[in-house]
C-alpha cells in the first residue's frame, strides 16, 4: 500500500528549483511509485527499466551496481514486497534541474519465510531526468525492528 502525506503534493518540501520543469515532482514521484509497484507485482524487468545503467543500491551494509543488484538482492526484494504488506509515506520530493531526490519512511508487518516481520524503514532515492523520463540513480534503504 502506498500512502502520501499532503506535504508530498504541495508546499516547500518538494519545491522545484531553477531549471526544473513544472510537474516534475509528480513525474519524479510516479517513477518511485512505479518502481515499488514493479517489485510488488514481481516484475523485475519493469523495476530494472526504472534504474539508470549506472545506478547503485545501498542495503544490508553493501553497495551494489545495477547488475549486482539484479543478480543478488532484486529477487529477495521482490519476494519480500509481495509477502509483507507495507505502508510508505513520502516525506520529501525535491528537484533541482535534472536531479531529484525522494525520501520516504515505511512500516512493514507480516510474515516472510515463516518469520514474523515488524519493521520501520527509511528510503532515499536519487533520480536524474533522461530522454526517457526520470530514472533512479541511487537507492539507500535502511530498516530496524519495531
Predicted feature residues:
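Short, low-complexity N-terminal intrinsically disordered segments enriched in polar/charged residues
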Residues: 3-4, 8-53
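Short beta-strand edge/turn micro-motifs at domain boundaries
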Residues: 11-16, 120-146
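Sec/Tat-exported extracytoplasmic proteins
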Residues: 32, 36-39, 43, 54-55, ...
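Hydrophobic pocket/interface hotspot
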Residues: 35, 46-48, 55, 69, ...
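A mature extracytoplasmic/lumenal domain signature
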Residues: 51, 61-62, 105-108, 140
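Hydrophobic residues on conserved beta-strands that form the core of alpha/beta folds
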Residues: 52, 85-87, 136
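Surface-exposed, charged secondary-structure patches
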Residues: 56, 71-117
Amino acid at each position: 500500500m502506498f500512502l502520501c502525506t499532503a506535504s508530498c503534493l504541495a508546499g516547500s518540501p518538494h519545491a522545484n528549483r531553477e531549471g526544473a520543469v513544472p510537474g516534475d515532482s509528480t513525474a519524479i514521484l510516479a517513477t518511485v511509485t512505479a518502481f515499488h509497484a514493479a517489485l510488488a507485482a514481481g516484475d523485475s524487468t519493469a523495476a530494472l527499466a526504472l534504474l539508470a545503467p549506472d545506478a547503485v543500491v545501498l542495503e544490508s551494509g553493501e553497495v551494489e551496481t545495477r547488475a549486482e543488484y539484479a543478480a543478488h538482492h532484486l529477487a529477495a526484494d521482490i519476494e519480500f514486497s509481495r509477502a509483507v504488506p507495507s505502508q510508505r509515506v513520502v516525506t520529501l520530493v525535491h528537484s533541482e534541474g535534472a536531479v531529484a531526490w525522494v525520501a520516504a519512511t515505511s512500516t512493514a508487518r507480516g510474515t516472510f519465510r515463516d518469520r514474523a516481520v515488524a519493521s520501520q524503514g527509511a528510503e532515499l532515492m536519487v533520480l536524474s531526468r533522461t530522454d526517457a523520463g526520470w530514472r533512479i540513480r541511487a537507492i539507500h534503504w535502511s530498516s530496524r525492528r519495531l
